[in-house]
């Protein structure tokens, strides 16, 4: 079989949507053993928490474009319509946190489903390489905000090949 779809259409309130999406990601991805201060911690759940809260909090609800969580063999990907403040990749070292829906952001922080504004980007950059050695999240802000999280080492190599600089680009970058 070339394709397997386990689709989930979520049309409920934000709290239930959060729980349903977290369960969906847990169902289709493996959890790896990791200790934080001698306590077993689910890195998968830490990553999922940031991904799910991002698509719920930063969504542009005036658009009919459906938010998506896509789990592939090697990747977790999201697509979410948003009002971009800038275009292109969001890097850990050069981004300015900006809540697209500040009331929702404060609510998610108050009920414990998110941390402070901007912590999601930092946490994705922190936990993705722990979950997938050598992996880095890819966050792309355009009209459709995309997050790509590698979940296998194959995805890490695939990403490196796709984003490898040419000799000319390397020379220009070093200038």
Which residue stretches match the model-derived regions?
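C-terminal regulatory or interaction extensions
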Residues: 1-175
């Amino acid at each position: 079989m070339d394709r397997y779809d386990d689709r989930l259409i979520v049309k409920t309130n934000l709290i239930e949507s959060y729980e349903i999406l977290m369960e969906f990601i847990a169902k289709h991805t493996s959890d790896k053993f990791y200790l934080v201060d001698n306590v077993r911690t689910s890195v998968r759940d830490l990553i999922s928490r940031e991904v799910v809260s991002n698509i719920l909090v930063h969504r542009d609800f005036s658009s009919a474009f459906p938010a998506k969580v896509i789990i592939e063999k090697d990747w977790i990907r999201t697509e979410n319509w948003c009002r971009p403040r800038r275009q292109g990749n969001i890097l850990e070292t050069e981004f300015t946190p900006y809540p697209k829906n500040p009331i929702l952001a404060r609510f998610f922080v108050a009920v414990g489903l998110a941390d402070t504004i901007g912590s999601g980007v930092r946490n994705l950059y922190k936990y993705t390489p722990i979950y997938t050695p050598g992996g880095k999240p890819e966050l792309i802000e355009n009209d459709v905000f995309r997050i790509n999280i590698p979940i296998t080492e194959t995805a890490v190599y695939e990403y490196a090949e796709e984003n490898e600089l040419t000799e000319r680009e390397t020379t220009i970058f070093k200038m």
